[in-house]
């Protein structure tokens, strides 16, 4: 049973289209410098074209990246692709304060996506052998987290209305021949803007937060020189 976090507010930030590396650094800085009283946050972002290689990533799963950069990431999992038309949602949750474990958070994220897709009349499911969300045998959402000092960062990437071709240049999440799909292939005309409010609402509902409070986001707020940088994103 999930906790009720009504006494803990959660902040929503809309980042728009951003390159991966500076946003990842900002997320690391937020996590490193947050305190026991820092509100949890959700960041919604679309990334410019990039492959990210997770901690478990193997070089043989990067087939032909071509002109798309490959960046090492400290999230869980293996290689994946991010690009415009894919909704990335980073979840910065204090698990100790919420009194939940990593497995509970993963389940909440997967259920968030499943319920979001159901809103658009798309049947989907999670798999015990491969994190993420699937429509039949095709993957529609990837998931990768990292926990530091009891707080989560990184999150999910939901394919909505994007060019799926770059996934053919890798073995997605380390699975050769993994077929990818997206919301617009199953429900034509659905956009990122359509999905965003449903995704946020379902995530806050899964964990019992009150309504997420939208606040402005500025990259410079997170990349101050006093914040130490990390070479692993």
From Swiss-Prot:
The record marks 139 as: Lowers pKa of active site Cys. CDD domains: LipB. GO terms for cellular component: cytoplasm. One of its GO terms (biological process) is protein modification process. The active site is at residue 173. It is found in: Cytoplasm. Its EC number is 2.3.1.181. The keyword Cytoplasm applies. The keyword Cell division does not apply. Keywords: Acyltransferase, Cytoplasm, Transferase. Pathway: Protein modification; protein lipoylation via endogenous pathway; protein N(6)-(lipoyl)lysine from octanoyl-[acyl-carrier-protein]: step 1/2. It comes from the Bacteria. It catalyses: octanoyl-[ACP] + L-lysyl-[protein] = N(6)-octanoyl-L-lysyl-[protein] + holo-[ACP] + H(+). PROSITE patterns: BPL_LPL_CATALYTIC, LIPB. Residues 36-211 form the BPL/LPL catalytic domain. Substrate binds at residues 75-82, 142-144, 155-157. GO terms for molecular function: lipoyl(octanoyl) transferase activity. PANTHER family: LIPOYLTRANSFERASE 2, MITOCHONDRIAL-RELATED, OCTANOYLTRANSFERASE. Belongs to the LipB family. HAMAP family: LipB. In the reaction, the free carboxyl group of octanoic acid is attached via an amide linkage to the epsilon-amino group of a specific lysine residue of lipoyl domains of lipoate-dependent enzymes. Catalyzes the transfer of endogenously produced octanoic acid from octanoyl-acyl-carrier-protein onto the lipoyl domains of lipoate-dependent enzymes. Lipoyl-ACP can also act as a substrate although octanoyl-ACP is likely to be the physiological substrate. This is Octanoyltransferase. It comes from Yersinia pseudotuberculosis serotype O:1b (strain IP 31758). The lineage of its organism: Bacteria, Pseudomonadati, Pseudomonadota, Gammaproteobacteria, Enterobacterales.
